[in-house]
Each structure stands twice: as C-alpha cells, then as structure tokens.
Amino acid sequence: MNRLSIIFPNLVMANATLPPNLAKIVERFQRHTDPKKRYEQLLWYGKKLEPMMEEGKIAANKVQGCVSQVYITADLEDGKVMYQGDSDAQLVKGLVALLIQGLNGLTPTEIVELTPDFIEATGLQVSLTPSRANGFYNIFKMMQTKAIAFQLGQSYGEG
C-alpha cells in the first residue's frame, strides 16, 4: 500500500479503473492539497500543450459553455483517438492539456465509457471558479462527443 492510498483511500482506489495516463494525472493533482500548487500544475500542463493548427479553430470545434475561447479537434489513428486543443486563457489551456494527455491514444469506446468522476478526484473543483469547473466538464463532454462520432463512423467538425 503506497502513501497516497493511505491518505486518499477512496480516490486512489477509484483511479485503478482509469486509463493509466489519466490515473497518473489524477494522482499528481491529489498530491497537492494547496490550491496554489494545483494552479501551478495546471499552468505547467498548459505550457507543455503543443500548438494547435489555426484551421482547427472553427465553430464546429469550439467548446460551448466556456467563458474562454476553447477549441478541440480529434483524429482517429489506427483505432485510437488523438486530440488537439487550445484556449486563449492559460489556466484553461492547462485543463485542455490535462485532458489531452489523459485521453490521447484511447479508443473511442474507452473515452465514451469514462465518467466525469475523475474531474472531482483531481481536487480541482476546490481550486477552480464555478465557471472554470463547468468549462472543464464541457471540454471533457466535447471530447466524448467527438469519440461518439468516431464510434458511429462519422467525422465531427473538421479534424
């Protein structure tokens, strides 16, 4: 039993059902109980986010319900979903990067079957304003919508 499982028994146990990359991200955020440290972690993710192609920034790829401008594109490569994204706000860019790192390389079915419970497990809802927390959820739902389109054999937006 590791130290985290002693401190956060329910949260770490829940991570066992998450895809490995997403579970690692959740555990990183669980290590930081200080909201400022979580913000710093988000900003770090945002800085690591690869630039998004400008042609992907179209209405079909815009996440609705976000105060910031947020765009998500998805491609299906060898049966795995690969996302790209961007935001005009650094903190939200970190949320986008967190989700991209956690979900890239999964099958559409794996993404669709995920519940948003992992968002709460990160502890970020304590650190984020209600509108940003809602935006985080909306970004995740947009990514799932694109995965559903792949399941149905359709493209969703451009990319």
Swiss-Prot record:
<dbReference type="Pfam" id="PF02657">
    <property type="entry name" value="SufE"/>
</dbReference>
<comment type="similarity">
    <text>Belongs to the SufE family.</text>
</comment>
<dbReference type="InterPro" id="IPR003808">
    <property type="entry name" value="Fe-S_metab-assoc_dom"/>
</dbReference>
<protein>
    <recommendedName>
        <fullName>Uncharacterized SufE-like protein slr1419</fullName>
    </recommendedName>
</protein>
